[in-house]
Amino acid sequence: EDVSCTTQSVNDPSLYSIDEASVEVFESREFRTEIFSDSGISLGPLGLADDRSVLNGELVTTNLVITNEGNVPLQFTVNVQNSWPTQLIEGANEVVNGDMSVNILAGNSLSISVNTIVPLAANKGDSNTMIIRTTLQDSETLINGTRLIIEELASLDTESSGQIEVALGKSSITQ
C-alpha cells in the first residue's frame, strides 16, 4: 500500500512537503481459547482448576470459546480426548466422538459446546479428564482441559405448599 503525506505550514501555505511511503501489513494469525462451565464460569487452566463434580447419567456441557485476534480468517480443527462419549456442537454442525473444523473471521469469536455423558456404570470417585485440542490449520495447537469426578451429591427435594416443622434430631413424614 502506498501512502502519501502532505505537510503544510499554517503561516505560509507555499511552504509544504510531500512524503511518500510504502506500507506492508503483515499477516497476524494470533488466537486464544478459553473454556467455561454451562453456567458461564471460566474453568481456567487444567492444572489449577477445581474438579467438577458430576453424577451418573448426567449430561455435562463445557463451552469452548475460540477468539481470532489476528487480521485474517483462520481455520481450526477441534477435537476432544475423553474416555466418555462426547459431542461437539457449533450452530447446526454436530460431531460425535470426532473432529470438528471451523472458520473464524478476523476479530471474531466462536463458541463450541462440548457435551459429555457420564456413564451410568461409573462408580463414586471415578474421574475423567477431558482434553480439548484446538489446532490452527498447519500451525500451533492450544490445549484446554477439565477434570470430571463422580461424587455423591446430597440433595433434598420437597414438595409442599406450606412449611414442614421438625424438631432437631427427629424425623417427620409428610404426605
Region annotations inferred by a language model:
Residues 9-72, 125-127, 134-175:
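Long, low-complexity ectodomains and other extracytoplasmic segments of secretory-pathway proteins
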Residues 67, 88, 122:
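Short aromatic-centered micro-motifs
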